[in-house]
Amino acid sequence: YQRMYYARTLYVGLRPGFDDEAPYARERESLTSADTILLVTGIANPRPLIRVCRRCKARIKVMHFDDHHDFSTADLVKMERKYAHLKGARKVIVTTEKDARRILQKRFFPEALKPYTFHMPLEIQIRPEYNATPGFIAKLKVAIDKQPRKRETPG
């Protein structure tokens, strides 16, 4: 017998890829129709992230790769070229937190892109209106603690 619990995923804020280098405000809402986002994804379904980015007024160009893509030097060169050809008062590269780990750890990541590269973390929100059982959070913590941990290896 299993219990069904409900949650949803939310993309939250913008975080700089390289903390010391980001010249722009970190809020999506600070982007305007004069700005452009180069959205780089290596996820199975980029549509929810695209929808979130469309909420701000900036124009969006998408570079989509397969799920769990291992970004190569050639991919980063394409990203740099595409970024160079973007129009906009401010141009930023946005990716998921998981893709950011894969991309930003590459030693061949272009230095010129570092100040303009951000990631959008994913947050899991428990739906209390559907999960009103007593002790739900305690049960959830126990279940999570029992799960084996997988670690991504840096590329």
Region spans (language model):
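Short aromatic-enriched loop/helix-cap "lid" or pocket-rim segments at secondary-structure transitions
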Residues: 18-20, 106-107, 132
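C-terminal accessory "lid"/substrate-recognition subdomains
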Residues: 1-89, 149-155
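Hydrophobic alpha-helical segments
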Residues: 82, 86-89, 106, 110, ...
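Short, conserved active-site loop motifs that form the nucleotide-linked donor/cofactor pocket
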Residues: 4, 91, 115-117
